[in-house]
Amino acid sequence: MVGTLPAGHTPSHVQSSLPSLPAHLQSDTHLTAHLASRFHVGLPTARLSSHALISLNNYTSSSKGPDGGKEGSAMGETEDLARRAYTRLGARGENQAIVFLGESGAGKTTLRSHLLSSFLSFSSTPLSSKLSYAAFIFDTLTTTKSLTTPTASKAGLFLELQYDASSSVNPTLIGGKIIDHRLERSRIASVPTGERSFHVLYYLLAGTSAAEKAHLGLDSPIHVTTAGGRLSSADHKRWRYLGHPTQLKVGINDADGFQHFKTALRKLEFPRSEIAEICQILAAILHIGQLDFGSGQATLTGAEESGGYSHEGGETVTVVKNKDVLSIIAAFLGLGVGELEASFGYRTKTIHRERVTVMLDPKGARRSADELSRVLYSLLVAYVIENVNQRICAAEDSVANTVSIIDFPGFAQACSTGSTLDQLLNNAACESLYNFCLRSFFDRKADMLEREEVAVPATSYFDNTDAVRGLLKQGNGLLSILDDQTRRGRTDAQFVEAVRRRFENKNPAITAGASGSGNGYGMVSQNARSSFTVKHFAGEVDYSATGLLEENGEVISGDLMNLMKSTRSDFVRELFGQEALQTVAHPKEKTAIMQAQVSSKPLRMPSMARRKTSPASRLTFDATPAEDPYETESQTGSSAKNSSAKRKSGMLMGGMQCAAGQFLSSLDIVNKCLTSGNLNPYFVFCLKPNDRRIANQFDSKCVRTQIQTLGIAEISQRLRNADFSVFLPFAEFLGLAEVGNVVVGSDKEKSEVVLDEKRWPGNEARVGSTGVFLSERCWADLAKVGERVIPSFAAEDDGGDALLHPRTANYADSKVRLLNPSDHSPGAYIYGDESKQASNTSRDFDGRSDAGYSAFNSGDMFHNLETREQMLEKGNEKQMEEVDEVPVSGSRKRWMAIVWLLTFYIPTPAIRYIGRMKRKDIQIAWREKFAINLLIWLACAIAVFIIVGFPSLICPTQHVYSPAELSSHDGKDGHSSYTSIRGLVLDLGEFMDSHYPGIVPDSALKKYAGVDSTALFPVQVSALCLGKDGNVDPKVLLDYKPTNFSGSVTSTSSGDPNSVYHDFRYFRDDYRPDWYAEQMIYLRANYYKGWIGYSSEYLHTLASKSQNVASINGKIYDLTSYIAGGRRIQGREGDDTTGIDTDFMDSLVVDLFQQKAGEDITKYWEDLPLTPKLRVDMMDCLNNLFIVGHVDTRNSTQCQFARYFILAISVLICSVIVFKFFAALQFGKKNVPENLDKFIICQVPAYTEDEESLRRAIDSMARMQYDDKRKLLVVICDGMIIGQGNDRPTPRIVLDILGVPESVDPEPLSFESLGEGMKQHNMGKVYSGLYEVQGHIVPFLVVVKVGKPSEVSRPGNRGKRDSQMVLMRFLNRVHYNLPMSPMELEMHHHIRNIIGVNPTFYEFILQVDADTVVAPDAATRMVSSCLNDTRIIGVCGETSLTNAKTSAVTMIQVYEYYISHNLTKAFESLFGSITCLPGCFTMYRIRSAESGKPLFVSKEIVEAYSEIRVDTLHMKNLLHLGEDRYLTTLLLKHHPKFKTKYNFRAQAYTIAPESWTVFLSQRRRWINSTVHNLVELIPLQQLCGFCCFSMRFVVFIDLISTIIMPVTVAYIVYLIVWLVRDTSTIPWTSFLLLAAIYGLQAIIFIVRRKWEMIGWMIIYILAIPVYSLALPLYSFWHMDDFSWGNTRIITGEKGRKIVISDEGKFDPASIPKKRWEEYQAELWEAQTSRDDRSEISGISYGTKYHPATQSEYGFPGSRPMSQLELPRHMSRMSLAPSEMMSRHMDMELEDVNLPSDDAILSEIRDILRTADLMTVTKKNIKQELERRFGVNLDAKRPYINSATEAVLSGNL
């Protein structure tokens, strides 16, 4: 073609083929200028002959040329390319491949869609539509908006169109295949600024209806904490996984996109329910992004825990703050809310062949959630694409040829999502494709041209082979090294070093930078500059190696896999069961999935790669199976399922390939397909005209850079020299040329003649030795392919199938249109061109009517499916199985009857729906809790009644004042002013304020204070008494002569001058008959204080003095003056006074008072023969005229009883306080105990404590002043867990402290644990050795609970109680000689044979928490107490706080800790009955000193304490809240004759809860466990001993106080209110009681000089409302707050109680057991058969023994163990030497290879008898002894020295 268009005849821009340009225009600059000239006239394309298309993205329209049609447009050129490829496919039977190259934003995806549309338009099958939909679905799931383009592809695409070549004219499209490579998963959780995540997520948010949004939870207000800490509200719809809210509106019609996506799935025959499930998973992914994590305290006790660690403190855990969002995710994933939340809080890793659970902080939980979202999206994409392929892919055997469209994401200079791995793999793919491009143009025909003896001028070009080999070479390329280092568990620094060693001075394309460092536990101290550099064809790129290996592993933790196994969603189960998810099973337990990985390799291979046999010209495999796993598949069958299974199994055996390795394999396959001999490649170079996406702007510098990068000028130059695309043998060539016999000569000569006739240029046609080389143009001309008719189905046929045509285009085309979409394109929504959107009807996509389609698209796709609530309830249900049947005890039945009696009125549905308690056992527990609370409140009410109500009931309150008491209210010395009128006591002081001082001054009134003022108020008799006949003459007067009852001046005289002011009687001028009555009513209403009171005894005294006084109904009446004639008549002047009767009282009444004076005449009064009216009238007269007061019963018998009853209770309480006081003072002076020789075990349970706490605890135990040889330090690590803030698992921290090197790795052995179902089977590792610290050398034993292989989360973790049981059960079996589990046998072996002590020797066990530090003399003092009293079974010491001033919460605990020990425990200790021996610091007696009978580890204790079925409220409170108290209860119950004591001299220091939440949780546990242990203590024998004052009784009284603690605060408040309201009657008894409580306490700490306790006591008193009111009430109500687990009891047939569990049924036979004697015999057999086996197998410690200086134990100097390690002995079964074969025979601590003291003493005497005493030295004697005994006696030096001195001094 060169020279066919002479320059100057036409404009240069008309020339579309760059090689056709003159030679002087072949430079980068001139080619750029030529492209610019074409670009500016609307021709954005050019060609590289027939091989390649160059397209510039004009950012406007890809389908319009200069004249408005598609001629000259990118779309037109791609159609032409497709037509040429299709022609060659049909004419030559070659496979075709079109490879797209170019940067992101250059339009590759758009041109790819045009190309696919063109190919599909050549076929007339409905399959074409399906392939279009398939491509659309792929793009929807894998494309996104980037900074450079709105449709950036983020997955490599190998799209295969499959053809059948049976048609002689045109090949038939029979299928297709989408092979996706490496989706950019990191984008899901990390959306770069200014970009979007994958389009489908935005489609879902915008395209769902209101009903669908409600179901998916997309309509709820969204609150996300932004990076700045601000809350973003629903107004902005801030979705964390969708980037900035502005990305929701960027001109892409997401709503229509969702409808098209659903339609495409329906057209590909996805069921409606499956489409709904897909949408639910997408919604779940969005919601995962919304999860907000925070730190909390684990205040609920789990089903397998027993109160936690760190002295009952709360473990810091990560919690989800927005539980509503969490429930949506759980519903869609078919999981329980609780287990999903818990799964975010930890992650299990495999480190150094050990599974370790890392406790995650909120940031770690966020990363865990992001991992879940990435996994879900990756699996969803894999699932959808695989299902699409199943619907479009043809059978492999029927495929004759294929057209492959290869489009990988453009080269990336930087990793926008922060994923270095994605960037590296993407660039490696670009490098490989570019290298294939270069080889196709420069190298592919070179060999053949040479064989055919055709000379072609060489062309220089940039060769990227170094980079390709460095990156992609199998075995030692960069990706292979990365994969290998990842699988080996190397660090990033080691990887960079490996890269340096491999490429330094060997390959210039790759250089290694600096490296970081790490500790091997995933906690890397990173160096930000750890990196390597690759010189790519597009420029150098620096890749950070930080975190690269972990990212390459792409490990899905076993936690997530284990979680998903429990899903109730069939769709989620299918997602996690597909072939794209590769799993790693434990080598010893195939059902246990250790980890998994989403494959980075496509599930399918190209059809070319799957052929069993191929012609030599076709693709052949030459890679080894190890290098290419696909090779094995291609040879073993075509079934995808079978091949996948084989691929998985191969990986598991040889180690799973990581992302880089899988991607490398898939790239290798792509490369081999492309380089097969039967494939013709085309290339599409896509260029950006500028970097700013400005339409119709051409940036020459930008374009020239791309031309240089892609080597277009060199390719063009090469094509000017050799543009050969087809090689035809002479016969074929001549046949096509239709050369008959006209031309005479050889075939070669004939061919030369034809070429001469055709006048083709030399670079396009050459004759070789056996055939002819032609360009595609020349071949097409020769073969007359232009005469072939290629069908183009551009209109709908009669059948109604909407085959792709220009009007509707197709999905693959429209979806990714970068330029202006064609009119009415269904893809116009992406670019916001709403005027051109197609109407949303089914016929836009498919002519067939799809039943229910319109309802599906416009309505609710979730209609008739499960609601979210149903899914959530289903997810919370567990798959349970029956594991056991349990009988129900009689006491339980009786208790439940009481519970139902107390709670029958609360309906179960209310508990279920309002309380949200679905399970029946939890509902029953709530009823029990409520019933217990009712009983507790009843007890409190009874207590209140006894304190307040009972005295008032027996002795009602009387408002009476004796005359003497009235006299005291005289207004003097601050006293109140009271006076009385006719027995009525009034408040004179109050009255004075309202009196008229102008008439009578206040001073005059004050003299009436304290006296009887009756004489001041004369009465009008006729107004107050109707008399015996109903009428009394007003002239009748009654004289008032006060009786001086008390003998003092207590009344005023009748002649008082002030009485005239109140005298309104008849004879006065101012007659007011009712004045007195009115005034008395007024005074009583306003100033009433009570009545004058006289006792019954005093009334008798008065009667004896001729006083006519008696009482009726408690009121006292005095008729003395009346009977004595104190009546007279006085009228006004002139009145007639004759005939007036002054006896107005009935004679019967008068006689009664005379006869029964001084008595209670109520009965007689009622018996008087009076008419009812007369009786009423007489009573009125008595009440108004003769009443003098009330009977005073305050000193009566019943009132005395009430008073002394309360006093007795007070005395009892005071006596307890006094006893506590004396108990605290009973100890004598501080004595230093002697050295003791008892063997003790010091046990420390460890969970997630930090290294500092563990080291403090361990060191304090080791440094105790107790014989080191007789101490055994036992540390039990509860699970392989990395606590928050730690960099290693807790067991590793412990072992590092003790000096055990990492190379020591014993086999895990089985033992029984406390757990549900199969969790009863646990496994542990046993370590032992010597720990040296500050001159102490202490033997230690470490038990690490590692769990079974099937445990993927928190392996081995079973709780603190289980850690205690490990040692308790072991000692129990030792003492009873019972069969032991393998781990217990190993423990026995270590203690007996390595440490050298028979386990039965140990007599005491000291249990200390991991955050507790013990005093140096603690063990000595405790053992001393136990030796002084052999009946002691447990002894505790005083625990103080080390963090007293950390927070207000700790401050209020200091004094409480001090008093609870020095008063409460000291008092209980008096009676030998401490009810709670704290687990943080207690020593127990293992066995009886005399008989050796097991005590602490007796069968009864061990069986009761190891209770597994903890399914009732009572048992949970006993074993999950207060296991320490319950253990003490068991000791008291089963060993009632033994004592539990307190020794305040034994000191320990612990850490108290520092936050209110943890403090509340701790006290809730303590208080509730106290209540439930009280129930356990009630049936104990000897509860009431002599005089009800035995040890048990007083303790019982003490425990009762726990229940009524709230009453204490109420009583104190009552006293304060009493004191404020009435200072006259102070309850001295109560205040003396309070003073005694705190006064005696003060004496205690003053005597002990604890002066600081004064301040702490004040703080404690201020906190009394917290301790006595808030905590108990909170605790009682939260008695059922548990993590209930999944084991429960249900009612089966006929009322049977059946235990069901989701943990499976435990078979005790699964753990073999043997007695120690049997195990020893096997050890002997193993030793004697050592010659028949490998000496390495089965050895627990794989370390070599280096003899070193012997310690006194016969061990090498112990610390650090990395220098002097434990011996490795030839035992198959353990790490220890056998007793028979080892040189450490009988390694008892006292005589390990050393002579006894007696033998040494005997020899010393012998030496001294013959030695020269003037010259002999102790050193000489020691050396002589060593010579005689033949052993090193350094360990015996102190004894030798002291014995020598003793012999010489004559003491021995």
Curated annotation (Swiss-Prot):
<feature type="glycosylation site" description="N-linked (GlcNAc...) asparagine">
    <location>
        <position position="1195"/>
    </location>
</feature>
<dbReference type="GO" id="GO:0031505">
    <property type="term" value="P:fungal-type cell wall organization"/>
</dbReference>
<feature type="transmembrane region" description="Helical">
    <location>
        <begin position="1626"/>
        <end position="1646"/>
    </location>
</feature>
<feature type="transmembrane region" description="Helical">
    <location>
        <begin position="930"/>
        <end position="950"/>
    </location>
</feature>
<keyword id="KW-0325">Glycoprotein</keyword>
<comment type="function">
    <text>Polymerizes chitin, a structural polymer of the cell wall and septum, by transferring the sugar moiety of UDP-GlcNAc to the non-reducing end of the growing chitin polymer. Plays an important role in polarized hyphal cell wall synthesis and maintenance of cell wall integrity. Its role in growth and morphogenesis is particularly important under low osmotic conditions.</text>
</comment>
<dbReference type="GO" id="GO:0016459">
    <property type="term" value="C:myosin complex"/>
</dbReference>
<keyword id="KW-0472">Membrane</keyword>
<feature type="transmembrane region" description="Helical">
    <location>
        <begin position="1205"/>
        <end position="1225"/>
    </location>
</feature>
<dbReference type="InterPro" id="IPR036961">
    <property type="entry name" value="Kinesin_motor_dom_sf"/>
</dbReference>
<feature type="domain" description="Cytochrome b5 heme-binding">
    <location>
        <begin position="958"/>
        <end position="1017"/>
    </location>
</feature>
<dbReference type="GO" id="GO:0005524">
    <property type="term" value="F:ATP binding"/>
</dbReference>
<keyword id="KW-1133">Transmembrane helix</keyword>
<dbReference type="InterPro" id="IPR027417">
    <property type="entry name" value="P-loop_NTPase"/>
</dbReference>
<feature type="transmembrane region" description="Helical">
    <location>
        <begin position="1600"/>
        <end position="1620"/>
    </location>
</feature>
<feature type="glycosylation site" description="N-linked (GlcNAc...) asparagine">
    <location>
        <position position="1568"/>
    </location>
</feature>
<dbReference type="GO" id="GO:0003774">
    <property type="term" value="F:cytoskeletal motor activity"/>
</dbReference>
<feature type="transmembrane region" description="Helical">
    <location>
        <begin position="1653"/>
        <end position="1673"/>
    </location>
</feature>
<dbReference type="GO" id="GO:0003779">
    <property type="term" value="F:actin binding"/>
</dbReference>
<comment type="similarity">
    <text>In the C-terminal section; belongs to the chitin synthase family. Class V subfamily.</text>
</comment>
<dbReference type="GO" id="GO:0030428">
    <property type="term" value="C:cell septum"/>
</dbReference>
<keyword id="KW-0547">Nucleotide-binding</keyword>
<keyword id="KW-0505">Motor protein</keyword>
<keyword id="KW-0808">Transferase</keyword>
<feature type="glycosylation site" description="N-linked (GlcNAc...) asparagine">
    <location>
        <position position="840"/>
    </location>
</feature>
<dbReference type="InterPro" id="IPR001609">
    <property type="entry name" value="Myosin_head_motor_dom-like"/>
</dbReference>
<feature type="region of interest" description="Actin-binding">
    <location>
        <begin position="667"/>
        <end position="691"/>
    </location>
</feature>
<feature type="domain" description="Myosin motor">
    <location>
        <begin position="1"/>
        <end position="787"/>
    </location>
</feature>
<dbReference type="Pfam" id="PF00173">
    <property type="entry name" value="Cyt-b5"/>
</dbReference>
<keyword id="KW-0328">Glycosyltransferase</keyword>
<keyword id="KW-0067">ATP-binding</keyword>
<dbReference type="GO" id="GO:0009932">
    <property type="term" value="P:cell tip growth"/>
</dbReference>
<dbReference type="GO" id="GO:0005886">
    <property type="term" value="C:plasma membrane"/>
</dbReference>
<dbReference type="Pfam" id="PF03142">
    <property type="entry name" value="Chitin_synth_2"/>
</dbReference>
<feature type="domain" description="DEK-C">
    <location>
        <begin position="1794"/>
        <end position="1849"/>
    </location>
</feature>
<feature type="glycosylation site" description="N-linked (GlcNAc...) asparagine">
    <location>
        <position position="1462"/>
    </location>
</feature>
<feature type="glycosylation site" description="N-linked (GlcNAc...) asparagine">
    <location>
        <position position="642"/>
    </location>
</feature>
<feature type="glycosylation site" description="N-linked (GlcNAc...) asparagine">
    <location>
        <position position="1044"/>
    </location>
</feature>
<dbReference type="GO" id="GO:0071470">
    <property type="term" value="P:cellular response to osmotic stress"/>
</dbReference>
<keyword id="KW-0812">Transmembrane</keyword>
<comment type="similarity">
    <text>In the N-terminal section; belongs to the TRAFAC class myosin-kinesin ATPase superfamily. Myosin family.</text>
</comment>
<protein>
    <recommendedName>
        <fullName>Chitin synthase csmA</fullName>
        <ecNumber>2.4.1.16</ecNumber>
    </recommendedName>
</protein>
